[in-house]
């Protein structure tokens, strides 16, 4: 047998996958901490009891109780809801449904969430960036100049990692600019911390608007991997063509339905109030800490701050078992670290450690 033309496994892989730098999730970055403030999770676990034991049967593709409960919570019709393995799968589904690899592009506005880029690159879709303005609002002219060939525009509001809301008038202008040209995806992963800012009421006006949601943040279920896509029925039907046949396991659907019952939603709102209170405590303390240059406003469960020596601060806290998220390499975020709001005890440990840093 000739071996002249044999290829290695790496050679057999698609070129874009060989060159791909995977998303550096908080867990992938690792660390041996006991204070985990790097992934925007809720700091304590919520207990659930499984009520569905029929694990010998395949689950529903779109579990009825989960869809109906979420639709009622979000104020939309069940036909406007799709549930998936986290909002990350929703990102991928939209790109797969609307973008032709090698032809179409997505557009996003850094500094922002990294999975828009990674998902597009994995699928083989061009990525275009229009950096946010100095105040981290949208550069509408820059976006307008890049719409030819762009099929999907991703906007995160509140934005991760900066924490601020996108100006609603700018969002409306964006939706008008893209009408008949591109899908606009509003990532509302953190909307429970500022529910008044949701765009769900705009779905009736904009057939090309898609909204991403998750149970990972305010619902304290990051380990469940359950997210939602809200859109008009025509969009949902297209996404249903490309989603896996059984995206949610029976236990995940069981717990999600419980979390979305009235009692679960009330508990979520209590957690939000607790988080907002702790966020203010942390902001006040950071503003009185010598190694902190600036604390940015936040509408979320995390705070972005600029430090006089962020790399050494990050490593020093890491060595003490306090794991933060380094944002230094993001555009316009030099010297910045992101701190998830933890328990009072965790927040105090962060402040004590920061105040012990040499200035």
From Swiss-Prot:
The record's annotation in Gene3D superfamilies points to: Aspartate Aminotransferase, domain 1, Type I PLP-dependent aspartate aminotransferase-like (Major domain)
Please write the reaction equations for the catalytic activity of this protein: L-histidinol phosphate + 2-oxoglutarate = 3-(imidazol-4-yl)-2-oxopropyl phosphate + L-glutamate
Q: Which residues carry this modification: N6-(pyridoxal phosphate)lysine?
A: 217
**Protein source organism:** Salmonella typhimurium (strain LT2 / SGSC1412 / ATCC 700720)
State the oligomer form and interacting partners.
Homodimer.
UniProt entry tagged with the keyword Transferase? yes
Q: Which gene encodes it?
A: hisC
Query: Has the keyword Cell membrane been applied to this entry?
Result: no
Task: Tell me which Pfam families the record gives.
Answer: Aminotran_1_2
Instruction: Please give the pathway this protein is involved in.
Output: Amino-acid biosynthesis; L-histidine biosynthesis; L-histidine from 5-phospho-alpha-D-ribose 1-diphosphate: step 7/9
- Which InterPro entries does the record match to this protein? Aminotrans_II_pyridoxalP_BS (IPR001917), Aminotransferase_I/II_large (IPR004839), HisP_aminotrans (IPR005861), PyrdxlP-dep_Trfase (IPR015424), PyrdxlP-dep_Trfase_major (IPR015421), PyrdxlP-dep_Trfase_small (IPR015422)
**Listed SUPFAM superfamilies:** PLP-dependent transferases (SSF53383)
Cofactors: pyridoxal 5'-phosphate
Which E.C. number(s) belong to this protein? 2.6.1.9
Q: Member of which family?
A: Belongs to the class-II pyridoxal-phosphate-dependent aminotransferase family. Histidinol-phosphate aminotransferase subfamily.
Question: Cross-referenced PROSITE patterns, in alphabetical order?
Answer: AA_TRANSFER_CLASS_2
| Name of the protein in its database record | Histidinol-phosphate aminotransferase
Q: Which UniProt keywords apply?
A: Amino-acid biosynthesis, Aminotransferase, Histidine biosynthesis, Pyridoxal phosphate, Transferase
User: Under the GO molecular function aspect, what terms does this record hold?
Assistant: histidinol-phosphate transaminase activity; pyridoxal phosphate binding
* Record GO biological process: L-histidine biosynthetic process
Could you tell me which PANTHER family the record lists for this protein? HISTIDINOL-PHOSPHATE AMINOTRANSFERASE, HISTIDINOL-PHOSPHATE AMINOTRANSFERASE-RELATED
HAMAP family to which the protein is assigned, alphabetical:
HisC_aminotrans_2
């Amino acid at each position: 047998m000739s071996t002249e033309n044999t290829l290695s496994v790496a050679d057999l892989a698609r070129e874009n996958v060989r060159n791909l730098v995977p998303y550096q999730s908080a867990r992938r970055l690792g660390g041996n901490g006991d204070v985990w403030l790097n992934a925007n999770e809720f700091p304590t676990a919520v207990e659930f009891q499984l009520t569905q034991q029929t694990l010998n049967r395949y689950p529903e593709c779109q579990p009825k109780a989960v869809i109906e409960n979420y639709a009622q919570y979000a104020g939309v019709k069940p036909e406007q809801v799709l549930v998936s393995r986290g909002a990350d799968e929703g990102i991928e589904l939209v790109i797969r449904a609307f973008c032709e690899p090698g032809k179409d592009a997505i557009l996003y506005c850094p500094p922002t969430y990294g999975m828009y880029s990674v998902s597009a690159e994995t699928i083989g879709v061009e990525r275009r960036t229009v950096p946010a303005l100095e105040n981290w609002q949208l550069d509408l002219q820059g976006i307008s100049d890049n719409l030819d060939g762009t099929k999907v525009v991703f906007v995160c509001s509140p934005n991760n990692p900066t924490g601020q809301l996108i100006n609603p008038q700018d969002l409306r202008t964006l939706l008008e600019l893209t009408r008949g040209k591109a899908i606009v995806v509003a990532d509302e992963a953190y909307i429970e911390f500022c529910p008044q800012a949701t765009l769900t009421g705009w779905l009736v006006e904009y057939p090309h608007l898609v909204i991403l949601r998750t149970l990972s943040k305010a619902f304290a279920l990051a380990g469940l991997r359950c997210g939602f896509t809200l859109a008009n029925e025509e969009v949902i039907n297209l996404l249903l063509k490309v989603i896996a046949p059984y995206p949610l396991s029976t236990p995940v659907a069981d717990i999600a339905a419980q979390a979305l019952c009235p009692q679960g939603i009330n508990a979520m709102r209590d957690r939000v109030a607790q988080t907002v209170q702790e966020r203010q405590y942390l902001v006040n303390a950071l503003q009185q800490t010598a190694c902190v240059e600036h604390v940015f406003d936040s509408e979320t469960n995390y705070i972005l701050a600029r430090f006089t020596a962020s790399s050494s601060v990050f490593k020093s806290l890491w060595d003490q078992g306090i794991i933060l998220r380094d944002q230094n390499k993001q555009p316009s975020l030099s010297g910045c670290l992101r701190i998830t709001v933890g328990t009072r005890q965790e927040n105090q440990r962060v402040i004590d450690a920061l105040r012990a840093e040499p200035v």
